[in-house]
Curated annotation (Swiss-Prot):
Known function: One of the early assembly proteins it binds 23S rRNA. One of the proteins that surrounds the polypeptide exit tunnel on the outside of the ribosome. Forms the main docking site for trigger factor binding to the ribosome.
Gene Ontology cellular component terms for the protein in this record: ribonucleoprotein complex; ribosome
GO molecular function: rRNA binding; structural constituent of ribosome
Subunit structure: Part of the 50S ribosomal subunit. Contacts protein L29, and trigger factor when it is bound to the ribosome.
UniProt signal peptide: none
Record family assignment: Belongs to the universal ribosomal protein uL23 family.
Stated name of the protein: Large ribosomal subunit protein uL23
InterPro entries cross-referenced by the UniProt entry: Nucleotide-bd_a/b_plait_sf (IPR012677), Ribosomal_uL23-like (IPR013025), Ribosomal_uL23/eL15/eS24_sf (IPR012678)
Key words of the record: Ribonucleoprotein, Ribosomal protein, RNA-binding, rRNA-binding
Gene Ontology terms describing biological process: translation
Organism of derivation: Desulfatibacillum aliphaticivorans
PANTHER family: 60S RIBOSOMAL PROTEIN L23A
Length: 95
């Protein structure tokens, strides 16, 4: 699997911003089939940083209603990546 297929997008929320500032931990939406080793290698290769730890979680999609029609958002996988001390990814600045 290509490293750019593994990492889909950063998850920018209030909680993830606090985790970044306090624990040097970033959150990404990743491919559901990717494992922790593949995620760590992809982050290291794309952003040229050292990854210490990867924690993953599968997020269930919410049920949404539009009128009579009931639909469901897709399930997705979230990866919380802890970077080495001193390492940082710049595109999160100012977000």
């Amino acid at each position: 699997m290509n490293v750019y297929e593994i990492i889909r997008r950063p998850v920018v929320t209030e909680k993830s911003t606090i985790q970044k500032e306090e624990n040097n931990q970033l959150t990404f939406e990743v491919d559901k089939k990717a494992n922790k080793v593949e995620i760590a290698r992809a982050i290291e290769r794309i952003f040229k940083v050292k990854v210490l730890d990867v924690r993953t979680s599968t997020v269930n999609g919410k049920f949404k209603r539009r009128g009579k029609v009931l639909g469901k958002r897709r399930d997705w996988k979230k990866a919380m990546v802890t970077l080495a001390p001193g390492a940082r990814i710049d595109f999160f600045d100012g977000v």
